[in-house]
A protein has these predicted regions:
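Alpha-helical segment proximal to the catalytic Tyr-Lys
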Residues: 136, 180-185, 242
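Residue(s) in the substrate-gating loop at a strand-loop-helix junction
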Residues: 151
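Substrate-binding pocket helix/loop in short-chain dehydrogenase/reductase
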Residues: 106-120, 202, 210, 214
Length: 258
């Protein structure tokens, strides 16, 4: 990497927390941040085995990385996660709020109170729980930034049975922009908005036939991959994006236009 690219896009010396980083898009983001030179905390909830394998993989490549578990729908466990990071680092430079899931497809009229609580807590409350506790650490960071994970569903209301999930991602859009104003000029806040990527998320919740249709309806005529998202996060966290805040970057092949 030449001097210009290193200065604008390198993350050497940065400390990053990626929630839900054991699999899928979160994993790809953690890999990209590590490759750019950041030291990365891989958060996991139920995927401890995958998290340990990722740590071993990145360490074998010369990366500085460790894993911490916790259920971020529980505010106390979110507090504990940040406390563990604070005990290791004196500050935090990058927070990626990636944890989230559709949980299950369901029409609104069939949504139980328990399912509603799980979907909203996992996709919205968790980001608030982690962020509010991490802000003091971020204030001690170097050009700190927060990256939230939204979804193309925030624009179109989601696919069949995903209305509540889509609403939580629309909340992430608004939360990102409001938080960007609230934390400026000290901390930048942006989001990325994936479309349909071939990860465990859509292998679990979307049929092969639906995936084929979505690919055909996407202007770039393919589905996304987890790896499509890491470079954008690296960019948003570096000096090259130092005048960007409150933005939601669409990484969905133009699906949000369709």
């Amino acid at each position: 990497m030449n001097a210009f690219l290193e200065n604008q896009f390198g993350l050497a010396g940065k400390r990053a927390l990626v929630t839900g980083a054991a699999r899928g898009i979160g994993r790809a983001i953690a890999e990209a941040l590590c490759a750019a030179g950041a030291e990365v905390c891989i958060h996991f909830n139920k995927s401890e085995g995958e998290a340990k394998k990722l740590v071993a993989q990145l360490e074998s490549q010369g990366g500085r990385v460790f894993a911490v578990g916790g259920d971020l729908t529980d505010s106390k466990q979110a507090d504990t996660l940040i406390a563990k990071i604070e005990s290791r680092w004196n500050g935090l430079d990058i927070l990626v709020n990636n944890a989230g899931d559709l949980v299950q497809r369901s029409k609104v009229e069939a949504f139980s109170d328990d399912l509603l609580d799980r979907v909203v807590k996992l996709n919205f409350h968790s980001a608030v729980y982690v962020t509010r506790r991490a802000i003091p650490l971020l204030r001690r960071g170097i050009d700190p930034s927060i990256i939230n994970l939204s979804s193309v569903a925030a624009h179109n209301g989601g696919s069949n049975g995903a209305t509540i999930y889509a609403a939580t991602k629309a909340a992430i859009h608004t939360y990102t922009r409001g938080l960007a104003k609230e934390l400026a000029p000290a901390i930048r806040v942006n989001a990325i908005s994936p479309g349909v990527a071939l990860t465990d998320f859509h292998r679990t919740h979307t049929t092969p036939e639906a995936l084929e249709t979505i690919a055909g309806n996407t202007p770039l005529k393919r589905l996304g991959t987890a790896e499509d998202h890491g470079a954008a996060v690296v960019f948003l966290c570096g000096k090259g994006a130092s005048f960007i805040t409150g933005e939601v970057i669409e990484i969905n092949g133009g699906l949000w236009l369709a």
